[in-house]
């Protein structure tokens, strides 16, 4: 019995997997159990930001494994404090709640919004994806994700993405928070217009709701800036982050401004594993590599080059840093053929391809990827 048959026998079938068993990775490449090499433009869905098995990350994790893996938030640990201080520097936020994933970060943000405002209602947008747990799912728009699990958290209303007039119709004095992806990832890579973001800011001023920016997919250099919010010059009340934060080691975070944080009390939320020493060390090491190797700048530079190359042959190419989407005739077939030819890509719909490679990708690897796609 092979690995795929064994998986089907024992693992809950919640994923549509490509027919390849990945065994190891290095940089922008992964290798299957037969030794075949693949250029990886998925990176664990925008997660393996500094490349597979980065040597600095591995060494830092080894050191921490020999010291302390886990204790509890009943006690203080140094990596957690160091990480919070570093995040304050790069994200411009004041307080941090650590958890294990993007969905958990969103759940925390929703709870904190209700606690801080005393209001109940949330507003999200068409095309937004915030996670699959019950709260995060409640502010996720796509019906196929939501319908089987209703009733969800309420009240929640959806406005049309990039439509200020639509938003104005649904926000009011009862709105606790507006949550938004400034670059929609699961929808296929669609950035928010500047006028739309300005409208959100003006309505926040008028009604006093909190602004939650979901940076789970866009954070840590993915868009060519540390965070997508940096493109717009805005100051959210909360930011959710995860994915690339630990470059493959599970860690998430809800970052808060002091005005929100001061209204959260001891016992309002918690996490057994959140902020454990190993995960925080992974995040610190990831940030160290991003800074040392100039990966935020590389994301902007390589993203621009990748988009230029793709526009020569594909339709509706949109890119923000190394978060890129484009259209093909049959996306599932395109993914399958790329896989056969040693290239990992991802489709978000019947026609839309999403590329979110490691931030260490080079011009040579971009050229190789485009060559495979065209062939």
Curated annotation (Swiss-Prot):
Pathway note: Amino-acid biosynthesis; L-arginine biosynthesis; N(2)-acetyl-L-ornithine from L-glutamate: step 4/4
Main location per the UniProt record: cytoplasm
RNA-binding in keyword set: no
Entry-annotated residues carrying N6-(pyridoxal phosphate)lysine: 243
Subunit structure: Homodimer.
Matches recorded under PANTHER family: ACETYLORNITHINE AMINOTRANSFERASE, MITOCHONDRIAL (PTHR11986:SF79), AMINOTRANSFERASE CLASS III (PTHR11986)
Protein name: Acetylornithine aminotransferase
């Amino acid at each position: 019995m092979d690995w795929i048959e064994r998986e089907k026998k024992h693992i809950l079938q919640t994923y549509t997997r490509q027919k390849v068993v990945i065994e190891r990775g290095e940089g922008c490449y992964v290798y299957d159990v037969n030794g075949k090499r693949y250029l990886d433009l998925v990176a664990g869905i925008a997660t393996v930001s500094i490349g597979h098995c980065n040597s600095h990350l591995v060494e830092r994790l080894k050191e921490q494994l020999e010291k302390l893996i886990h204790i509890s938030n009943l006690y203080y640990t140094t990596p957690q404090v160091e990480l919070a201080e570093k995040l304050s520097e790069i994200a411009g936020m004041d307080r941090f709640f650590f958890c294990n994933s993007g969905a958990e970060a969103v759940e925390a943000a929703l709870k904190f919004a209700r606690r801080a405002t005393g209001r109940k209602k949330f507003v999200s947008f068409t095309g937004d994806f915030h996670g699959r747990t019950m709260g995060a799912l409640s502010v996720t728009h796509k019906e196929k994700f939501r319908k089987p699990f209703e009733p969800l958290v309420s009240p929640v209303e959806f406005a049309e993405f990039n439509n200020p007039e639509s938003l104005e119709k649904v926000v009011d004095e009862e709105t606790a928070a507006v949550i938004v992806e400034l670059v929609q990832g699961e929808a296929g890579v669609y950035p928010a217009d500047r006028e739309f973001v300005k409208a959100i800011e003006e309505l926040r001023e008028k009604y006093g709701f909190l602004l939650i920016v979901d940076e789970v997919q866009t954070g840590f250099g993915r868009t060519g800036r540390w965070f997508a919010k940096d493109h717009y010059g805005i100051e959210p009340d909360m930011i959710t982050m995860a994915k690339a934060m630990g470059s493959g080691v599970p860690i998430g975070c809800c970052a808060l401004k002091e005005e929100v944080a001061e209204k959260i009390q001891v016992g309002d939320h918690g996490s057994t594993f959140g902020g454990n020493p190993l995960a925080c060390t992974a995040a610190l090491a990831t940030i160290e590599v991003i800074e040392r190797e100039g990966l935020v700048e590389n994301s902007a530079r390589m993203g621009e080059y990748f988009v230029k190359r793709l526009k020569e042959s594909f339709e509706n190419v949109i890119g923000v840093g190394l978060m890129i989407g484009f259209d093909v005739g049959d996306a599932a077939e395109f993914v399958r053929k790329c896989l056969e030819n040693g290239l990992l890509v991802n489709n978000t719909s019947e026609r839309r391809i999403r590329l979110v490679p490691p931030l260490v990708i080079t011009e040579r690897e971009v050229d190789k990827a485009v060559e495979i796609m065209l062939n």
